[in-house]
Design a protein with these regions (language model features):
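Phosphate-handling DNA/RNA-contact segment within nucleic-acid enzymes
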Residues: 5-136, 153-154
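Conserved phosphate-handling catalytic cores of large alpha/beta enzymes
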Residues: 125-126, 134-175
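Conserved alpha/beta enzyme-core scaffolds, especially Rossmann-like or related mixed alpha/beta domains
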Residues: 1-3, 174
Length: 175
């Protein structure tokens, strides 16, 4: 949980991380405000299991409920997904991947033994994200929430699934 700005500043100073570095990496806004203050933090990994960005869930009623790192030299929201470090291995072993809406969905499925789950950090699943997952499996199960946003997102997935370069089997389950 990112609550203590003083400790964070001390860490940055000790590790020679400048405000410019933090801004380029999407941790502070252009006016110098910490973007992830008072949030539960979720590290967003690359497919090589390096942390490239963060998502944050507000722990109070101030600001947006969820906030993701801005696009940076390391992170492009339309290309990256949220998953745990076991995602690729589990996806290859099970032969399929779950795509769910959010961070807590991924963590809940992991706890149940489904480390083959990932999230676009919302409902805006893109062609590029589907293409990335298709490198590890040809079977993708879309499990968005059974609300208006989830249903619309499912329709968008059905529209873009034929653009994937590989033969991919996509099933949509609105839960």
């Amino acid at each position: 949980i990112s609550k203590d700005e003083e400790s964070f500043n001390k860490f940055c100073k000790t590790n020679e991380i400048t405000k410019d570095d933090l801004q380029r990496l999407g941790f502070i806004s252009s006016n110098g405000n910490m973007l992830f203050k008072n949030r539960i933090m979720f590290p967003i990994l690359s497919f090589r299991n390096n942390i490239i960005a963060f998502g944050g869930r507000a722990i109070d009623d101030f600001g947006p409920k969820y906030l993701n790192s801005s696009d940076s030299v390391l992170y492009k929201k339309n290309r990256n997904l949220y998953f745990t470090n076991e995602f690729i291995t589990a996806t290859k072993k099970k032969g399929y991947a779950f795509i769910v809406e959010g961070y807590f969905d991924v963590l809940s499925l992991n706890k149940l033994g489904y480390a083959n789950s990932a999230s676009p950090s919302g409902t805006a699943l893109t062609y590029q994200q589907l293409e990335s997952v298709s490198k590890y499996t040809s079977k993708i199960l879309i499990c968005f929430d059974n609300d208006e946003a989830g249903l619309k997102a499912t329709e968008r997935v059905l529209e873009i699934k034929n653009q994937i370069s590989k033969q991919v089997e996509i099933h949509c389950l609105n839960l």
